[in-house]
Amino acid sequence: SSIFIVKNFDPSQDYRILLAVDDSPGTSRAIKYGARVAQAFNIGVDILTVSKNEEFRDGYKGAAHRAAKFLRRSGIDAKNIFKVGDPSDTIVEIATNNHIIIMGASTRSPLKKFFIGSKPLDVMENCSCPILIVK
């Protein structure tokens, strides 16, 4: 199941997907959903990978490159964007009104979400564009 939150949607707007990618289990499902949406609406995908420090984990880079390869093989215009910073804040900063954010749901336990928070929830609360959270 997935959650689609629509904020400031304009049917006349030329959209791109902002696909948030890391090495979490939800990323592969988000990539597949992103491909379906991109194909259905004939739009391109910006694959965003954010690391808290300059050293990107191998899993992050690998996931981003696999996503780009999968999307391009599906006939979708895709480009990778690598940024350093807080993941939630960076996703919100990069996302513009012509983006539809697609990201995997958090895999944290309810207790961890309460104390630490959740990237998808943080993004959802702070972004001004549509967002699809894939579970």
What does each model-identified segment do?
Residues 6-8, 48-50, 81-85, 134:
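Conserved beta-strand termini and adjacent loop/short-helix elements that scaffold enzyme active sites
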Residues 1-9, 97-135:
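Gly/Ser-rich helix-loop-strand patches that form or flank binding pockets
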Residues 86-91, 118-119:
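Short acidic active-site motifs
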Residues 13-61, 65-81, 94, 100, ...:
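Small/aliphatic-rich secondary-structure junction motif
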Residues 9, 22-23, 83, 107:
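Structured loop/turn residues at secondary-structure junctions
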